[in-house]
Design a protein with these regions (language model features):
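Short alpha-helical elements
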Residues: 1-183
């Protein structure tokens, strides 16, 4: 997996030192469907937090999304009118240190505030103490606040740019999720 992620290679271009492509692909999809990758991410996140002297389960997170173009035909995709991109949207939640807690991929036409409950509903059981979320202005609105309260008593704090800022501005709490998306 790390080999494919690093090189961005299609399955058929795996080097000959690997097992047959069909075997590697079959095991990857089997592990994905059994949610093994989620379990691995969960264990690594908790271990990394404990190593740094933090509680294993985060109590706060930072949510954001990123629209990306898709060139392939077929598959789910939509049009993000705000970013003028036809493709998919990566919706991620990180802890306050920028470690990935959960990610959801969906069509780009889903607004941020409509995609947030999809991300947060998945992690209620795995991270029971995570109840506060920092977000940007795209998540503002009572519709999202009501949905989060119904899901699991979430609270959301919108971190906005100052009205006088020009150009790029590092925002407290928000920069960690931006860094994670950039990687």
């Amino acid at each position: 997996i790390l080999y494919l992620l690093r090189g961005g290679l299609p399955w058929r271009m795996l080097p000959p030192c690997f097992p047959p492509v069909s075997t590697v692909r079959r095991w990857f999809y089997l592990w994905r469907d059994n949610r093994l990758w989620l379990g691995i991410n969960h264990a690594l996140l908790m271990a990394a937090r404990e190593t740094r002297g933090r509680e294993a389960s985060p109590s706060a997170g930072v949510i954001d999304s990123q629209s990306v173009k898709t060139t392939e035909s077929g598959g789910p995709r939509g049009y993000d009118a705000g970013k003028k991109i036809k493709g998919r949207k990566r919706h991620i939640l990180t802890d306050t240190e920028g470690n990935l807690v959960h990610a959801v991929i969906h069509t780009a036409d889903i607004q941020d505030r409509d995609g947030a409950p999809l991300v947060l509903a998945e992690i209620v059981k795995r991270f029971p103490w995570l109840r506060h979320v920092f977000a940007d202005g795209g998540y503002a609105g009572n519709k999202l606040k009501d949905a989060l309260r119904r899901t699991a008593k979430w609270t959301i704090e919108i971190i906005k740019r100052s009205d006088t800022a020009k150009g790029f501005e590092v925002l407290p709490r928000r920069w960690v999720v931006e860094r994670t998306l950039a990687w």
